Amino acid sequence: MHLIDPPSSDVAFTPSVKAVQVRKGLRPAHRAIEERGGFATRITPDLAGFIAAQTSVFLATASRDGQPYIQHRGGPPGFLHVLDERTIAFADFAGNRQYITLGNLAENPKAYLFLIDYAHRRRIKLWGEARVVEDDAELIGRLMPADYKARPEQAILFTLAAWSANCPQHIPQRFEAADVAAALGEREARIAALEAEVARLRAGAA
C-alpha cells in the first residue's frame, strides 16, 4: 500500500488547527494550499537574499513539556548564513547565559524562526529543527561576522521543514537608523547644492 506523505503545511495545520479553520469557515482556502503540496520546503534564491539582508531574527523553542520560549538574535547583514536550500546557520553570541534555548534544544529539537522586514513590511515564518554545535571552531569562525564586536559561544544550525510568507497587514513601517541617516544626508547635500546655485545666480544678477 502506497502511503501519501502529508502536506508540508501540516507542520502548522494540526488537527486542532484544522478544526478551528472549519469552525471559522476558512477550511476550503487552506485545503487548497494542502492540495498544492502545502508550504514551500526549500530556500529559494529570493528567500536566501531576504535572509542575508536581515539584522534580526526571533528563534522559538520549547521544552520537552511544551513550555515555549522565544529569543531574539541579531547581528550585521549577513550574520544569518544560508548553507544550502534546507539549512540556515549563525554564530550564537554570548548573552545573558540563562541557556534556555540550548536547554530546550537538548531535549526538543523542534524550532521556529520568525523574520520581519519592517521597511518593506514583509515577514517570513520558518518551521524546522535546530541543533547546537559547540565543538567546531572552524564552523563557528566561518559564521562569525567580520569585525563584529561579539564573542561566539557556539553555532546554531537550523534545518528547514517548511516556510511561509505573511501578508503585510498590520506591520508598522520602520526604517534602520543607518538608512534614515543616509537618506537625510542625501537631502542635506541636495539642499546645499541648491542653495549654492541660488547664491551663484544672485551674484550673477547683481
Regions found by a protein language model. Name each.
Residues 1-206:
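Binding-site signature for planar aromatic cofactors or substrates
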